[in-house]
Amino acid sequence: LAPLKTVVPYTILVDRQSGYAETIKGLAPGALTQDNAIAQAAIVQYVIARETFDASDLRANYEKTALWSDGPTRAAYRHLFQKGNPDSPLTRYPATTIVSTTVKSVTMPRTGSATVRFDTIRHDQGAAGGERRSWTAVIDYRFSGAPMRMEDRFVNPLGFQVTHYRRDAEDTAPTPVQFDSALGVPTR
């Protein structure tokens, strides 16, 4: 006799700070389509470029984010960096501050939409510690076949464009982070 029930194991990852739970799926051949893989890679690159602050590559990240944004999303992003905007990273952070971004997960509930969970870690030059914030971004995107300059095509070969971007904090206060003094990286 064969058993009537089949046990299917699942691995569930629970975020210690926010309590957010997600099912972890192993890699299986054919589980991720090429289109989804390309979309996820573009989404991750976009979030990292948009949320990272580092004076050494600020211009490249700004140009990439503006190029990869469309319509109101591009206008809102450009407004964020205008002089006199109190919410601008240029106003909030000194030039020696580095905010690094690490993407934790990308969920794509439907074509053209993604939810991205990520952390930002702020480190001020010379400080032994910093702060970690956890975020969730809801993104709508598309691939546009609109003509673009050749140098822009090198940065965005498939015409990836974010049409909506909303970022919300997962936690109410930043978590303190200590840095390894020799390496300048967060200790776990």
Segments (PLM) and residue ranges:
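Structured, amphipathic secondary-structure segments that form assembly/contact surfaces
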Residues: 1-10, 16-37, 41, 51, ...
